[in-house]
Amino acid sequence: MQENLSDCDVLFGVKEVPIQDLIPSKTYFFFSHTYKQQPYNAKLLRACVERNIRLIDYELLKKNGNRVVAFGRFAGLVGAYNGLRGWGEKYGQYALKPAHECRDMQDMFDQLKGIDWPADLRILLTGKGRVASGAVETLVASGIPQISPEEIAGYEGCFWSQLDVEHYYKTNDGRPFDRKELFADPSGYESDFMRYVPFAKLYIAGHYYDSRAPFIFTRADAKLQDFAITYVADISCDIDGPVASTLRASTIADPFYGYLASEEKEVRHDDPEAIGVMAVDNLPCELPRDASLSFGNELMTHVIPALFDGDKDHIL
């Protein structure tokens, strides 16, 4: 180990590198959180340009259209667990050990065994990608019954249901839903999420959000009388965006807060009038053993070889 990296050509990180630590004329790999034009990292991107830095963002490394390096599965695994944990803490119905206190993923799953899930724990999960797939693993481990979106309205008792884009978006003029059209240009679509809201209590947001797309639910929606959701685990964690209750990111040490819809402000997590919110933005860090092993394997399999074989698979 050495602190002086001036003789290195390529530097690997994970999260954003502090601007003051960027070394000019190097190649950096890290999650920059800039490619969606996130305003809070504009200075970081500008610094890379000014310092002649080649920035390679893990989010954009793909093979055959699929990302080769990602933590999404682990964000989903922990995010769904934290949602279940937060619900239990807010309503005092059961207690779960924090994920970061578990030895590994299996230990986390073991915490879910033997829980007597309350009948009013009715869960919606949005998304079908890596994040949502991780959340599904946790929900399956919980033993809570899964039902189809079509069964939600008439179902009694505890359940979870996974919604894909055709469930929570619809065209804004009544024309048939077109998945390819939605992904290419979502401007002709609007949220259809509210048709499920009266029948659910916990919402787990595991979708990918395009900034051009409609919000899933708005602050006005959250004020409606039939808005029955009382807890939101926002794994995607787009601040002040598609999930109206996410006012800020939370931390592993302090993962929960409350959102008072009537006043559109943050309040205590245990406020009886508040929607509970879990919005930790570095969820994979709660399972460092599993996440690090997976990340390292993906780097060694896909990225490191590309630096030496002329990038024959056009990953870089």
PLM features per residue range, with description:
Residues 10-91:
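Phosphate/diphosphate ligand-binding glycine-rich loop within oxidoreductases
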